[in-house]
């Protein structure tokens, strides 16, 4: 059924990670600009709420990230209840999320349609399989990259381009050096960005990122050539020539664009740096056949990202990239080739949301009385 262009939609977004703010922000703004109603429910994780505030996006925080599996299970239960209550209040036509059990369950309860966006292979852990098993069957539409196999009805799967390009595509992002200059960073001077993730999410169980010894070697190597800015979910290191990120969270992509190199164990920021044309070296224990499709694509098809599980091999690649004078021009050429192949993911997702919208939201299950 073709969407009715005159109909006003009510769309609820479930945002649980900083990257999801970026993924959905342009979709949300486009919906608002064309007269549709939106609501955002959020999770207090890392800088998620800071980003929403910086972009002026109204939101309701439903829970806070906690450490350990028992606490995470408890938080999930809290989000189930609070997401459903928020949906009852807002009466959405569509609920949009990443792989989020509370979002799809709330949609089922209130009679809304649900759109789930994912680009992640389901790992072999019991936790990973369970999380997807209690999400995907309840979704009306599952958006995934071409070639990703998911254990759900093929009829409700929709192909969606590389998700980071929903906010890093040139139609959506223009690098601005003035924001860096206001915060004491000269974009023409050499600097590197290093990222240390927390490795405490459900899909991180059994894996590890950059070790302390390799981290210190990376910083020593990079600081010989310029400033080193560190984004970390771990404790602040001592005795190293490293600085905290100099810009507010909403300017991180400008910082990544102008950086000479990125080194880290985070999947999201590694991908973002690569797509911005910054040489990106990713180091964690997941590298290999079990690695996510996007990392393999950026490395094999475009040569923008290099993933390693061996610290010494990663250090050798960092050294080679830093000493190769052809690197900047070559990486711009590689990025251009990626963008030539890339659609505007925001437009794709907008179309999917409009086509998925339920005819009405009056089919919602009434709230219990008494």
Please annotate each region the language model reported.
Residues 32-76:
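Conserved nucleotide-sugar phosphate-binding/catalytic loop shared by glycosyltransferases and other
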Residues 45, 55-59, 63-66, 194, ...:
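Catalytic donor nucleotide-activated moiety binding site of glycosyltransferases and closely related
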Residues 275-326:
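Catalytic binding pocket for nucleotide-activated donors in carbohydrate/polymer assembly enzymes
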Residues 325-370:
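C-terminal amphipathic helix plus adjacent low-complexity
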Residues 95-106, 255-294:
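A donor-sugar binding/catalytic signature common to diverse glycosyltransferases
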Residues 115-117, 126-142, 256:
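A conserved, positively charged/aromatic
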Residues 78-83, 234-269:
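Donor nucleotide-activated moiety binding/catalytic core segment of transferases
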Residues 139-209:
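A nucleotide-sugar donor-handling region in carbohydrate enzymes
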């Amino acid at each position: 059924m073709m969407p009715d262009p005159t109909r006003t939609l009510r769309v609820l977004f479930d945002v649980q990670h900083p990257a999801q703010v970026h993924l959905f922000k342009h979709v949300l703004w486009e919906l608002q600009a064309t007269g549709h109603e939106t609501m955002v429910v959020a999770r207090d994780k890392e800088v998620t709420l800071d980003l929403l505030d910086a972009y002026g996006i109204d939101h309701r925080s439903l829970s806070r990230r906690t450490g350990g599996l028992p606490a995470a299970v408890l938080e999930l239960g809290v989000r189930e209840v609070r997401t459903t209550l928020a949906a009852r209040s807002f009466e959405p036509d569509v609920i949009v999320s990443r792989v989020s059990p509370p979002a799809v369950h709330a949609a089922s309860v209130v009679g809304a349609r649900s759109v789930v966006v994912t680009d992640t292979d389901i790992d072999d852990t019991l936790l990973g399989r369970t999380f997807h098993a209690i999400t995907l069957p309840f979704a009306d539409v599952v958006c995934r990259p071409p070639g990703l196999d998911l254990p759900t009805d093929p009829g409700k799967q929709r192909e969606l381009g590389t998700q980071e390009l929903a906010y890093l595509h040139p139609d959506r992002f223009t690098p601005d050096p003035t924001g860096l200059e206001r915060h004491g960073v000269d974009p023409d001077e050499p600097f590197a960005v290093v990222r240390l993730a927390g490795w405490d999410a459900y899909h991180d169980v059994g894996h590890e990122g950059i070790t302390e010894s390799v981290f210190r070697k990376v910083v020593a190597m990079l600081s010989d050539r310029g400033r080193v800015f560190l984004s970390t979910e771990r404790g602040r290191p001592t005795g190293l020539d490293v600085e905290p990120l100099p810009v507010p969270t909403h300017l991180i992509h400008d910082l990544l664009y102008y950086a000479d190199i990125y080194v880290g164990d985070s999947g999201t920021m590694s991908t973002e740096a690569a797509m911005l044309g910054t040489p990106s070296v990713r180091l964690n224990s997941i590298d290999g056949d079990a690695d996510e499709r996007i990392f393999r694509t950026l490395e094999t098809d475009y040569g923008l990202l290099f993933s390693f599980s061996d610290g010494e091999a990663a250090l050798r690649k960092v050294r080679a990239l830093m000493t190769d004078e052809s690197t900047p021009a070559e990486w711009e050429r590689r990025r251009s080739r990626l963008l030539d192949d890339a659609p505007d993911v925001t437009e794709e997702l907008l179309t999917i949301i409009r086509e998925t919208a339920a005819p009405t939201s009056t089919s919602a299950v009434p709230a219990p009385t008494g």
